[in-house]
Amino acid sequence: TNMLSMLGNGMLTSLLIFCVTLLFSLPLGLLVCFGRRAKNPILQWIFRIYISVMRGTPLMLQLVVVYFAPYYLFGVSLGSLFGGNYRLIAVLIGFIINYAAYFAEIYRAGLESIPVGQYEAAKVLGYGRMATFQHIVLPQLTRRVLPTVTNEVITLIKDTSLAYTVSVVEMFTVAKQISAAETDMTALFVAGAMYY
């Protein structure tokens, strides 16, 4: 039972990372998608670079950069601002900005798959831009991107174990610690069953 309570505490951290990442990265991804599709070429370029960097570098590296960069670039110890929770906050920031880039590309592909005739028909019917998006584009977009977003959500579940990179103790890290201390693999199997 001690093992299960320790794994339960780790599971709560994993669930927190998962839920907060989804809560913020899904809408942020939509904003990044709009920025990527903006008519302003400078804005479009900035978001294209952001997406390329986030999708082209490993999440583990991004977590390390988010955690250590403020101190090494600005000499600011953010740990003193946030206390012991800065590790978790750094993990959340890293996950959110990483997954927002992936969701932005998923949304962009979904938006580009909607025929131009849909927009033209909405304009002829007197819909404004927001009404067109809300009543015509968004329902189609949701249906088109749902399978890909679901795949990304499954990847996020597995990626929560990368929080150990900056010493955030989530479920898989707890399982490794228990297995190392007791020289028994049961904790890893239980964690694996809970994870996957």
Residue ranges and their predicted role:
Residues 1-196:
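Transmembrane alpha-helices and adjacent helix-loop boundaries
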